[in-house]
Amino acid sequence: MVMKKLEEIADVFSGVQVSRFVDPKGEKTPIIKNKFTDSYSLDYYYENISNRINEKYYSKKGDIIISLSQPNTVSIIHEDGFIIPMYFAVIRVNEMYDPSFIYHLISSKDFHKKLHIFCEGGALRVIKVAALKSIKLNIPNLEKQKQYGEFFNLIDKKNMLIDLKKDYNDKIKEYLIQTQIKGE
């Protein structure tokens, strides 16, 4: 394993100020919101956007985004073509590293403890992209990264299914209670 700064393994930059590129004649484009619908997916909205926007601000599969304000929510992008706004940092992992593994490292409590040290501000604490770039990560070889990344993804899928099962069980319970109240 080797300690590397985040900037050594990925391009790290902030998103774009979307309001500068809103154009009524532009193409309807999905823009990521700073709110997440649940712990497994991003929320987004559509806006007419000019074609002058730099391609780097469009998501690519495997991009990792982190909210620059607390709680510094982290997500991995599964689709190309979303505009990433300025309140996110984009971590575009280099080819020699596994995006899934890096995503799980950045989602960890240990990483968030390191991140907390660099947060600035009073009521609204934010992280600067320059500080984010300087955070060091312990990185194994690519083969191990891929193995760990796949394993962590399976754990996430299992947790998602457990949550889904709980939601369905709660709905069944509520339905049965309602039918009993109505006397059916």
Task: Specify the residue positions occupied by each region the protein language model found.
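Sequence-specific dsDNA recognition surfaces
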Residues: 5-20, 34-61
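Short, surface-exposed loop/turn microsegments at beta-strand edges and helix-strand junctions
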Residues: 22-29, 56-59, 76-87
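Non-catalytic DNA-recognition/assembly elements of restriction-modification systems
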Residues: 1-28, 37, 138-184
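A short glycine-rich beta-alpha junction/loop motif
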Residues: 82-86, 121-146
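A short beta-sheet element
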Residues: 67-106
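Glycine- and charge-enriched low-complexity intrinsically disordered segments
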Residues: 100-122
